[in-house]
């Protein structure tokens, strides 16, 4: 659990994100949706391809809430997701953030709650994931 400004905790003990130093040997999660958004285009396959060419593991648990909890407890080093609904991710994002994760939308804007996409990870993995997502995300209009 977590409350803003108080950190994350599990079974009365403080939790923190992993101390992973970079993408190499990290474990990432993802969530994707076939729902189209009229405000942007995003090529998930290109991001996946770029990241999978690194020395890391990528998985999809099928549960964004579980993945965010795993980031908060150091079991997963980061994730990227698009096509999400705020009510599905808000609590998990707060727990991850309070446990030391960095979070933004795909453009790097920390106002991720206004978007249906985000990157969430340990501080030293964050920029690498964002760098792999950004080129394939394009605002329309």
Regions found by a protein language model. Give the residues of each.
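Short, structured beta-strand-loop surface elements
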Residues: 105
């Amino acid at each position: 659990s977590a409350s803003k400004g108080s950190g994350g905790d599990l079974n009365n003990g403080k939790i923190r994100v992993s101390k992973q130093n970079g993408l190499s040997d990290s474990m990432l999660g993802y969530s994707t949706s076939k729902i189209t958004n009229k405000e942007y285009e995003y090529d998930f396959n290109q991001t996946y391809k770029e990241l999978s060419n690194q020395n890391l593991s990528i998985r999809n648990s099928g549960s964004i809430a579980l993945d965010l909890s795993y980031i908060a407890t150091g079991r997963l080093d980061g994730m990227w997701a698009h096509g999400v609904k705020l009510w599905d991710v808000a609590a998990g994002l707060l727990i991850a953030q309070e446990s030391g994760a960095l979070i933004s939308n795909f453009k790097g804007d920390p106002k991720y709650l206004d978007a249906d996409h985000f990157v969430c990870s340990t501080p030293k993995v964050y920029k690498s994931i964002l760098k792999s997502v950004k080129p394939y995300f394009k605002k329309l209009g």
